[in-house]
């Protein structure tokens, strides 16, 4: 099999290897009111009172970011963050398929280590935990 050409066809066909799937139903008014407003306010207020509950009340407990600045992508060298996205998506697929972990690709357009670290901290809401 010609993996390069077949993979390129797959990428054109799928237009990305990831998608978000809802875990909560929204097929009627009651389900929608539980998953979103007004019911969601209860979870928000619980987390407001105790931030650690975000791990119990959201998918945060099982979600990671796969981060790159695009400078060292699978031996391709410095190809940039946009060109690194297919590899990051592939890694996210592996996290889910083999570990059951939800992974989100985060391709940062900066080569400055402090920028990248700060972006990750801000994205994950852990910046306050480190102060």
Model-derived features: positions:
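Gly-rich Lys/Arg/Thr-decorated short loops/hinges at beta-loop-alpha junctions or inter-strand turns
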Residues: 28, 68-78, 95-105
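Solvent-exposed alpha-helices and their adjacent loops that cap or buttress functional pockets
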Residues: 55-60, 96-97, 122
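Short beta->alpha junction loops
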Residues: 106-113
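Single conserved hydrophobic/aromatic residue that forms the stacking wall/gate
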Residues: 123-131
